[in-house]
């Protein structure tokens, strides 16, 4: 696998060569999925490299660790500075993707780890383009409703961005691609729309914007929150409410949001065209506002951008 620009890894407060980043086969996380992680974008802007909403991502990392009773042995400031140090060390001057991960490392195997079970932290960074394909941001993607549902409430905490949670996402995305789609959409256990395999979802009908609520089994994404706030600034109201499957087919526009996906239009669901099958006007408007954060065209959000 070619992780372009990836030369060094930050691991437990040390910078090591990429190829030296290894874990023991009896690490707890390898057996039980006991890891929490983040995905963070770095954008090239007219005033230099900027990390997008770094503080919010690091806070969510610690929230996820708290839910799983997994204390991270570094401060938030130390992890934030390590992310920026790694960008500099790897000389990722055209933008990057950062992946910090905290995980239960080598120790006694068992489902209930002891309080002193070691928690390791690693950070990787590399160049990464569009998540769902080179032309996805402009032309949109074809998606299907998955046969796999999101988990029921009080089963697995969906507000934790945890490694084990993503086995569900792997099933959804793998099924979609095997069937010839770009991505899959999961329903919740009550049959309502939840989210994509690794993305939140917005639907537009008759000028109104809808997105599934937190109670639908979603991870409430930071890009999702960004879009909601950009809508508020533009005088667009986002309604967080349940969405039926058939509402997808009848929508005027649908788009995914996520750190990796950014704002990606959906052109069809289950081979049914959405609108005219092209990127809609509101989706385009929000894309422009989102990417304008990094070009300087969208003003008054400098607090979301942190210099390297």
Predicted features and spans:
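Helix-start/capping segments and mature chain N-termini
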Residues: 1-74, 80-85, 108-308
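Ordered, amphipathic secondary-structure segments that act as subunit-interaction surfaces
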Residues: 72, 76, 83, 92-100
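Non-catalytic accessory segments adjacent to catalytic cores
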Residues: 88-90
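Short loop/turn motifs enriched for small/polar and acidic residues
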Residues: 101-105
